[in-house]
Amino acid sequence: YSPEMVDGLTVGYGQGDVETTTGTKLDDTAMYLKYTYGSVTVGYQENERSAAATSNAIDFEAFGISYAVSDNITVAYNQSESKNGADADVQEASGISASFTSGGMTIAGVMNDVDNVAFDSANDTEGYELNIAFAF
């Protein structure tokens, strides 16, 4: 939904439930805000999963910002945090990306870091990617 009174603002909300097994119900709720002003876009999202078993309950929160330096170059930063109701370890992720486009060619790179993957304090990971794409 994009309210007319605030140009560049988009908001969204959704909810639903799933019965995974007989008598086991998961309630999911998600909401987001995105605001674009000129060449800057900022986004925020929250998700919540409620369940009778705390091991199935998850809270998720994310924030991101991107900046179009020019028509050809964009840089962005994102971070998120997930909490599991049955676990003290919080999964934290962050990433930086940049892209350059010229004609039909795009060169893009990302660096991501995730701590406590799957809520396991001994499971941290990093990832890097460089992508070159051509459109014909």
Regions found by a protein language model. Give the residues of each.
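Outer-membrane beta-barrel proteins
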Residues: 1-136
